[in-house]
């Protein structure tokens, strides 16, 4: 008998963030937004900083849990496991902290206009800006394309 749900686990280095039965998971991979559900072909994909949309088993078609997720990877087999450095629910995002981190990164970029694009500092500033934008979007309810 076919099932319309699959087990999802979201794991960070410090904790099991989420475990539950879901109907659909949408993540931002390096190839763009991708959705995974029960019966999906096996896959292992790298994740980019982005939004994680979770439609839990039995939820209404337009009812989603949304969180901000950092880089990592998703492993899709008989279950779906997401490994990531950081993840947080929309309701847990501290906007003061987000805006402060964003301002610091923007300030660094202004003070270092000639920095090498490949330098660790430049890559870190760009990553902080990307995370801040995603966290802001998620706090506002998410912006799925």
Regions found by a protein language model. Name each.
Residues 7-9, 13-100, 104:
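Compact, glycine-rich, soluble single-domain proteins
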Residues 1-5, 143-145:
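Short, charged, intrinsically disordered terminal tails
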Residues 87-145:
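Acidic/glycine-rich phosphate/pyrophosphate-binding loops and surrounding catalytic core
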């Amino acid at each position: 008998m076919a099932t319309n749900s699959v087990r999802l686990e979201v794991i960070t280095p410090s904790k099991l963030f989420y475990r539950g039965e879901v109907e659909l998971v949408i993540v931002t991979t390096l190839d763009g937004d991708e959705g995974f559900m029960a019966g999906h072909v096996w896959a292992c994909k790298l994740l980019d900083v982005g939004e994680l949309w979770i439609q839990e088993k039995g939820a209404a078609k337009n009812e989603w849990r949304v969180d901000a997720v950092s880089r990592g990877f998703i492993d899709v087999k008989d279950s779906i496991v997401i490994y990531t450095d950081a993840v947080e629910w929309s309701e847990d995002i501290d906007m003061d902290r987000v805006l402060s981190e964003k301002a610091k990164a923007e300030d660094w970029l202004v003070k270092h206009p000639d920095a090498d694009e490949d330098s660790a500092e430049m890559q870190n500033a760009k990553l902080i800006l990307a995370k801040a934008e995603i966290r802001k979007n998620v706090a506002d309810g998410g912006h799925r394309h």
